[in-house]
Amino acid sequence: MSREAFDVPNIGTNKFLKVTPNLFTPERLNLFDDVELYLTLIKASKCVEQGERLHNISWRILNKAVLKEHNINRSKKRDGVKNIYYVLNPNNKQPIKPKQAAVKQPPLQKANLPPTTAKQNVLTRPMTSPAIAQGAHDRSLDNPNSTNNDVKNDVAPNRQFSKSTTSGLFSNFADKYQKMKNVNHVANKEEPQTIITGFDTSTVITKKPLQSRRSRSPFQHIGDMNMNCIDNETSKSTSPTLENMGSRKSSFPQKESLFGRPRSYKNDQNGQLSLSKTSSRKGKNKIFFSSEDEDSDWDSVSNDSEFYADEDDEEYDDYNEEEADQYYRRQWDKLLFAKNQQNLDSTKSSVSSANTINSNTSHDPVRKSLLSGLFLSEANSNSNNHNTAHSEYASKHVSPTPQSSHSNIGPQPQQNPPSANGIKQQKPSLKTSNVTALASLSPPQPSNNERLSMDIQKDFKTDNESNHLYESNAPLTAQTILPTALSTHMFLPNNIHQQRMAIATGSNTRHRFSRRQSMDIPSKNRNTGFLKTRMEISEEEKMVRTISRLDNTSIANSNGNGNDDTSNQRTEALGRKTSNGGRI
């Protein structure tokens, strides 16, 4: 740092040096790009005010240039001016120059304008209705207070700006800062194009007439034509339904929708009811709101609501709903009556019950519903099932009688009177002939059961018998649930099933050979507890063959010597088996 950069009023041991503000003038700002300035601050840190902070800041700026930018000669003006200025002038308590105060006065004068001059540029439109004019006169008494409050709120931030003081070493930075501050914080409010000074809540907001304003909305030109067409269609559609209900109800209450036009029910000269629409648009106060563009197609209150409301009212009218409810109620009563009539007539005869239901349904001249005939079909199916079941039951319980090959011999079969259920039963009578034989009531029919072998039939019989062999100590619920589960979704293991079959039939199980087991195929019999080698398995198979052969020979030989020989051979084979087990 050069000598002129320091202000040395008194040189002494108890005095400290101070960095002069002239360092921040535009002529000397280029010194912040030089490394010599920062090195001088580092060396003179012990005898300069805020020397430690200047020392640290200087080192930080140099290290940033070397390590981050990899160039110590890079421009360090921004970091140096910003950091060193805030160290030397931390509080900003210097007074503002007169030039800066003069710069700040124009926005304050602009903000202090009276509210009347600020409101002169706003376009206002008077109200034509006397009720709205009266509401405007009543509300105008409260407006001065509200407008004064708004002006005070707008001027308050500007006064705060005037009270805040900033100190700078050069005026151009402070002027630019203050101008930017005023631009950022002064809110330019956009006033609406149309202001209504008073508004009465009791007035009805409607659309402005078509001839009084200019618009390009397609609904305005076509709306009246559509309304006339809709009136004609509704008068045609509702006339037949009203004729049906004219004898029951003479008058209907007048209903009015929220947006649609009210309508009243009137009697014509012929005594028929008809719908008539009454227009209630006359005598209402009208307020027209437009957007910022006078030629815009959109209005805040549109006539489309009336157009669609009329359609909704005509489509979903209460009268039509009542008629539909009564129609479906009559249909439901007919179905219930048909079901009850079917139950009553079934005691007499099935044919007569079907005829009565057909006659009851044929008398109705009104259109049929989708549910018509539901109970009729169910009743017919139930009666047919009942007839077939009863005939099968009667045929099973009739005692078998002898039949003859000659049908013309003997008395004719007698017919019994009809039973309580209206079904005629025919019992076969005795027929006398030369040749008599007992036969089944139904002729034999070829079936697939003949193809089954006798072995399969025997197995089926043993399976049915084995189901009732077990005895359980379980409670009654388990005794009833377990057989059902076994017959539906539970299956017994094969070995247990085979054991029960063997016990039931008493067959010899010694001739049954188990599957070959080895080291590769683990044994399913877990009673042994160890695995066998192939040699042991082959020896056991040989032993089983010899035992079976000896048993067969023992049956053939009935003398005592033969029995002794076979017993000796069997003991020798068993001795070899036990010796092999002892080795393992």
Swiss-Prot record:
Regions of compositional bias (Polar residues) in chain numbering: 114-127, 229-254, 267-278, 343-363, 398-432
Residue numbers spanned by region Disordered: 95-167, 209-279, 291-320, 343-366, 381-432, 551-584
Intracellular or extracellular location(s): Nucleus
Keyword annotations of the record: Nucleus, Phosphoprotein, Repressor, Transcription, Transcription regulation
GO biological process, one term: mitochondria-nucleus signaling pathway
Matching InterPro entries: AreA_GATA, Ras-cAMP_regulatory
Known function: Negative regulator of Ras-cAMP pathway. Involved in transcriptional regulation of galactose-inducible genes.
Protein name in UniProt: Negative regulator of RAS-cAMP pathway
Native organism: Saccharomyces cerevisiae (strain ATCC 204508 / S288c) (Baker's yeast)
